[in-house]
Amino acid sequence: MSGHNKWANIKHRKAAQDAKRSKIFTKLIREIIVAAREGGGDPETNPRLRAVIERARAANMPKDTIEKSIKKGTGELEGVDYQEIIYEAYAPAGVALYIYAMTDNKNRTAQELRHLLSKHGGSLAESGSVAWLFERKGIIEIPKDKVADFEEFAMVAIDAGAEDIIEDDPIQVVTAPEKLTEVKDNLASNGFEGEAKVTFIPKNTVKVTGADAEKVLKLISVLEDNDDVQEVYANFDIDDKEMEEIMAKLEG
């Protein structure tokens, strides 16, 4: 899972630096609207809304934008009716893609994704052919510099209900999705504040190198640039150094 975590961390760092901030806001607004629609507008009783609000604040989204998005979700303000859809696909080298989208037009989104996949050596897959390769989990990311003693932190995390702890930067605390908020709050009460999200972790990975690695990362980058795509989960395993080099090349 470390390969895809590295990819996520690179994207997170880029987001703080480049012109894609407006695109990130667009995606976060959709998540807030859907979370409020599904679970109500009070983040204290809606863990999903609470988590996305925290991410929006971390991205420096204005408070007014957050509040208006919540009201669009609850129906207090007029808003677009977004649907959550999972598209399953394959990238070059047999890498499985689990594409999470929010759209107001399923046909448009499917057509656009089919075009992007075809253009970059991928293809849409039949429903169910990829889903079994991924496991839904909660992830809490704790900045490594906030943890002085990893072993001590790991014990605290396990006592808090964590299933696994991955020593990376940021440190990844893995939980059952339904325990995400509980574990996050327990860690926070012990002085470890972190960003929480629900994600899909591959059960096994496909080692990819060279030209294939570049094609896979290019395809995922292009897919995530699509306004309707919230996140692309993949089961690739690409060496960290090679991934950094490819990303620098793609950005250039």
Swiss-Prot record:
Where in the sequence is the signal peptide annotated?
none
Q: Name one GO molecular function term.
A: DNA binding
Keyword vocabulary terms for this entry:
Cytoplasm, DNA-binding, Transcription, Transcription regulation
GO annotation, biological process: regulation of DNA-templated transcription
Q: Name one GO cellular component term.
A: cytosol
The subcellular localization recorded is:
Cytoplasm
| KW Transcription (keyword) present | yes
PANTHER family attached to this UniProt entry? TRANSCRIPTIONAL REGULATORY PROTEIN YEBC-RELATED, TRANSLATIONAL ACTIVATOR OF CYTOCHROME C OXIDASE 1
Instruction: Tell me the protein family, please.
Output: Belongs to the TACO1 family.
Which NCBIfam families does the record associate with it? PRK00110.1, PRK12378.1, YebC/PmpR family DNA-binding transcriptional regulator
Q: What is this protein called?
A: Probable transcriptional regulatory protein Tmel_0985
The organism's lineage?
Bacteria, Thermotogati, Thermotogota, Thermotogae, Thermotogales
